């Protein structure tokens, strides 16, 4: 792996002014809250936040009620470190198992500068169910989004997602089923091959692109030419971001387009269970020795 594994926190219980109000996927909760209060919805036709803030900043940021979100995740075996990633953390207060978190000391994410990454204090975590509580004074300005846990661990999806020890190896096949359902970085496979130089062609995979040494393959035929082997050939599949940033509940999982509406589907086009696409290299590459 070229980055840490990820667990997406996108389903929560929510409380308005201390009263339990429901449970569900975070973007659907955002819509439910806004509809119940007669507030404008976020979406493809919304007035952009910067415009609202510039021309109606007082009402845009006016607190309307206290909102609390409770996210649950399970730790089967304690890893050496877990970090929490949040977008616009300055708008929220965070508590892990009742212990406050200080995002003022968080680092900027290397994925997107809108994210801040905070290493959690491991003494605040327990093996078993852990609860992340997120509080805010809700206003039109507030954006409810997913939060992300990252670290050197495996992930198992379910009604409550769980963390378990990082798998020692990754085999050919769908990495979603191997403990990496939300992972979207690079995975390097070590391909056994006698010393020499090879053309390497991959015919069965799903990733953004492939690379080895300083060469990349982005279009068919997915062939990397004149790659050296010292006994193994490093072959990296750089995965897409779909299983990290969604849509994560839309049916079908693999869609040729992605618009704001795809994140808030309902009825037959929505499943509370995660709808993830298969990713990784599914079968050994074809090697042609030069």
What does each model-found stretch correspond to?
Residues 73-98, 132, 191-216, 233-237:
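Aromatic-lined ligand-binding clefts that engage carbohydrates, nucleic acids, or primary amines
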Residues 94-118, 206, 210-224:
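Solvent-exposed beta-strand/loop surfaces of large extracellular or lumenal domains
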């Amino acid at each position: 792996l070229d980055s840490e594994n990820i667990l997406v926190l996108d389903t929560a219980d929510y409380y308005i002014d201390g009263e339990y109000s429901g449970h569900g996927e975070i973007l659907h909760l955002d819509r439910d809250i806004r509809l119940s209060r007669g507030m404008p919805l976020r979406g493809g036709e919304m007035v952009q936040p910067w415009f609202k803030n510039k021309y109606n900043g007082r009402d845009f940021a006016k607190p309307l009620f206290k909102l609390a979100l409770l996210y649950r995740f399970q730790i089967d075996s304690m890893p050496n470190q877990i970090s929490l990633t949040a977008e616009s953390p300055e708008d929220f207060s965070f508590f892990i198992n009742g212990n406050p978190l200080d995002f003022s000391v968080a680092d900027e994410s290397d994925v997107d500068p809108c994210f801040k990454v905070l290493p959690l204090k491991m003494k605040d975590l327990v093996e078993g169910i852990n609860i992340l509580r997120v509080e805010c004074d809700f206003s039109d300005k507030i954006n409810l989004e997913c939060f992300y846990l990252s670290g050197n661990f495996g992930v198992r999806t379910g009604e409550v997602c769980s963390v378990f020890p990082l798998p020692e190896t990754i085999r050919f096949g769908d990495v979603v089923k191997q403990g990496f359902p939300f992972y979207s970085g690079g995975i390097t496979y070590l391909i056994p091959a006698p010393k020499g130089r090879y053309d390497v062609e991959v015919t069965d995979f799903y990733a953004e692109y492939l690379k080895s040494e300083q060469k990349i393959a982005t279009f068919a035929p997915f062939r990397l030419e004149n790659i050296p082997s010292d006994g193994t050939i490093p072959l990296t599949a750089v995965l897409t971001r779909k299983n990290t940033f969604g849509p994560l509940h839309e049916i079908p999982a693999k869609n040729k387009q992605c618009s704001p509406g795809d994140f808030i589907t309902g009825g037959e086009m929505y499943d509370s269970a995660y709808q993830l696409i298969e990713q990784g290299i599914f079968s050994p590459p074809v090697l042609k020795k030069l």
